[in-house]
């Protein structure tokens, strides 16, 4: 019975750009293409950025400017948990009468797990609860910014050169109306990438970014090349002999979390701004319809669109596995679950000889020859013990039990290899009412809903053989 909860034992094949085998719970179903989709054959789109601590939502441009970090929340540099702001009272001298003191609130950062505080590294307390915390400066920040600016300018130059070469190759195919004077103006103002057909109502602001090629070029950024140092500063004489206090030495993970500073001792650990998380949408690459789209609000866990495969495709699970032995036929009990509200007809088929998808099978399988009918999903009937079951005239040699939208069936497995895990493959053919089909005017012969037949390749892993 434990195998009933092990969904990773049952894999479905996704026929996309790359064949992927995954549990049904990790797949999506495109109602427009009527095909399974995995995370490797969908387009990922970022909908919003938000902080997991304060749940502040920000646009992509602002998140990029802040380096995808929250300005108000911090992570503990010791244990990586979220830091909290704590208040304390300190005595301060009055500016009018230094002999008198008054109590004033002060705020500092503290970790509730490892007891790290901002006072451990000498950070001054703040008079306000949010913002204004001192951050260590990277000694190489100026050099890095210079390099980034230089390579951005270099990339822009290379892009302009590529556009000019493309324009030069297209000159032989330009119409007669494209005169030499026009080409000269295009080259002079670098309009190679802006040759677009004028649209009605187009704004003249598109020309605001143009500049002359000569005399108005941006100031060229020059950098000093890095120079190798002949003499390296030697290590201290007591480097190998002095005792090491492990509580004051940072771990490898703590150093990698601060690559700009590379702290060696615990006294150099400074809090880091918390990383932002994203809400993303998934889109089918074939038809470009959304498969998953979450709510924009960070506090909401609901989805506007969530086409997970377990809500549309019959799910196969292993209920009981007998003792499997080499070249001995055994009977395995499977369960089929209908996730939709209407009746579903399912037919199990054995893989044909030379099937390119049947590459992992190590055993021979005999599936029920008859068509199976799965009752529609009804949440109320599942818990109603007094409900009268429908009469499907099941064959007891094939169907072990039936309850609500679930049915238990027998298959026969004969291992063909003396060692290794036992894996069987078969095809599952089932009908599906495509609710996403275009609506047409109903006629006498039209049922109103398009019914299509889908075939899924299913792989079952039964574990190792017994001696």
From Swiss-Prot:
The modification Phosphoserine is found at residue 203. There is a cross-link at residue 222 (Glycyl lysine isopeptide (Lys-Gly) (interchain with G-Cter in SUMO2)). InterPro entries: DCTN4. The modification Phosphothreonine is found at residue 414. GO terms for cellular component: cell cortex; centrosome; cytoplasmic dynein complex; dynactin complex; focal adhesion; kinetochore; sarcomere; spindle pole. Subunit of dynactin, a multiprotein complex part of a tripartite complex with dynein and a adapter, such as BICDL1, BICD2 or HOOK3. The dynactin complex is built around ACTR1A/ACTB filament and consists of an actin-related filament composed of a shoulder domain, a pointed end and a barbed end. Its length is defined by its flexible shoulder domain. The soulder is composed of 2 DCTN1 subunits, 4 DCTN2 and 2 DCTN3. The 4 DCNT2 (via N-terminus) bind the ACTR1A filament and act as molecular rulers to determine the length. The pointed end is important for binding dynein-dynactin cargo adapters. The gene is Dctn4. The keyword Coiled coil applies. This is Dynactin subunit 4. The modification N-acetylalanine is found at residue 2. Keywords: Acetylation, Coiled coil, Cytoplasm, Cytoskeleton, Isopeptide bond, Phosphoprotein, Ubl conjugation. It is found in: Cytoplasm, Cytoskeleton; Cytoplasm, Cytoskeleton, Microtubule organizing center, Centrosome; Cytoplasm, Cytoskeleton, Stress fiber; Cytoplasm, Cell cortex.
């Amino acid at each position: 019975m434990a195998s009933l909860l092990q969904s990773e034992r049952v894999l479905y094949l996704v026929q996309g750009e790359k064949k992927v085998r995954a549990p049904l719970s990790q797949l999506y179903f495109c109602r427009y293409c009527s095909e399974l989709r995995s995370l490797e054959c969908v387009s990922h789109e970022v909908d919003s950025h938000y902080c997991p601590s304060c749940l502040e939502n920000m646009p992509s441009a602002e998140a990029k400017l802040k380096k995808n970090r929250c300005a108000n929340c911090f992570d503990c540099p010791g244990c990586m948990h979220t830091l909290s702001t704590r208040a304390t009272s300190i005595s301060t001298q009055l500016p009018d009468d230094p002999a008198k003191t008054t109590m004033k609130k002060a705020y500092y950062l503290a970790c509730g797990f490892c007891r790290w505080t901002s006072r451990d590294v000498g950070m001054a307390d703040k008079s306000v609860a949010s913002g204004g915390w001192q951050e260590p400066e990277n000694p190489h920040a100026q050099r890095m910014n210079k390099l980034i600016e230089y390579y951005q300018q270099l990339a822009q130059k290379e892009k302009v050169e590529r556009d000019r070469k493309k324009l030069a190759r297209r000159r032989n195919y330009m119409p007669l109306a494209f005169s030499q004077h026009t080409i000269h103006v295009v080259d002079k103002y670098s309009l190679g990438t802006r040759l677009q057909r004028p649209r009605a109502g187009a704004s003249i602001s598109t020309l605001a970014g143009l500049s002359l090629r000569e005399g108005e070029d941006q100031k060229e950024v020059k950098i000093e090349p890095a120079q190798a140092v002949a003499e390296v500063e030697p290590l201290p004489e007591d480097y190998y002999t002095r005792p090491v206090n492990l509580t004051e030495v940072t771990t490898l993970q703590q150093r990698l979390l601060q690559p700009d500073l590379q702290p060696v001792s615990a006294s150099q650990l400074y809090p880091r701004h918390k990383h932002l998380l994203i809400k993303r949408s998934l889109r089918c690459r074939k038809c470009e319809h959304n498969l998953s789209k979450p709510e924009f609000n960070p506090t909401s866990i609901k989805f506007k669109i969530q086409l997970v495969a377990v809500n549309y495709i019959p799910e196969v699970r292993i209920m009981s596995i007998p003792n499997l032995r080499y070249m001995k036929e055994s009977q395995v009990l499977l369960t089929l679950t209908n996730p939709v509200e209407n009746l579903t007809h399912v037919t199990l088929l054995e893989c044909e000889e030379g099937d390119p998808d049947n590459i992992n099978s190590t055993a021979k399988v005999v599936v029920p020859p008859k068509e199976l009918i799965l009752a529609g999903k009804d949440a109320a009937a599942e818990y109603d013990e007094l409900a009268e079951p429908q009469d499907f005239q099941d064959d007891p040699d094939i169907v072990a039990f039936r309850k609500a939208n679930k049915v238990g069936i027998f298959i026969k497995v004969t291992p063909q290899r003396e060692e290794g895990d036992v894996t069987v493959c078969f095809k599952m053919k089932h009908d599906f009412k495509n609710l996403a089909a275009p609506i047409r005017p109903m006629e006498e012969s039209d049922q109103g809903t398009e019914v299509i037949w889908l075939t899924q390749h299913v792989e079952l892993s039964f574990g190792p053989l017994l001696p």
